[in-house]
């Protein structure tokens, strides 16, 4: 089985891992209530998705 001839340096390792990161979720305003919500998901504040009420949200 092959083994590395040289040790991987900190710089090379960190440069390789530079693209491994978390991405921010795609937020968009809800067309019904205007609150920010995750795209392609039901709005947690009003319960609407695609112009229809999907879940019943109790108003506080």
Curated annotation (Swiss-Prot):
GO terms for molecular function: structural constituent of ribosome. GO terms for cellular component: large ribosomal subunit. Keywords: Ribonucleoprotein, Ribosomal protein. It comes from the Bacteria. One of its GO terms (biological process) is translation. Belongs to the bacterial ribosomal protein bL32 family. This is Large ribosomal subunit protein bL32. The gene is rpmF.
């Amino acid at each position: 089985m092959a083994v590395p001839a040289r040790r991987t340096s900190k710089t090379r390792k960190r440069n390789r891992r530079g693209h491994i990161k978390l991405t921010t979720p795609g937020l968009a305003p809800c067309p019904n209530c205007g609150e920010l919500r995750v795209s392609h998901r039901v709005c947690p504040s009003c319960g609407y998705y695609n112009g229809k009420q999907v879940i019943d949200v109790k108003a506080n």
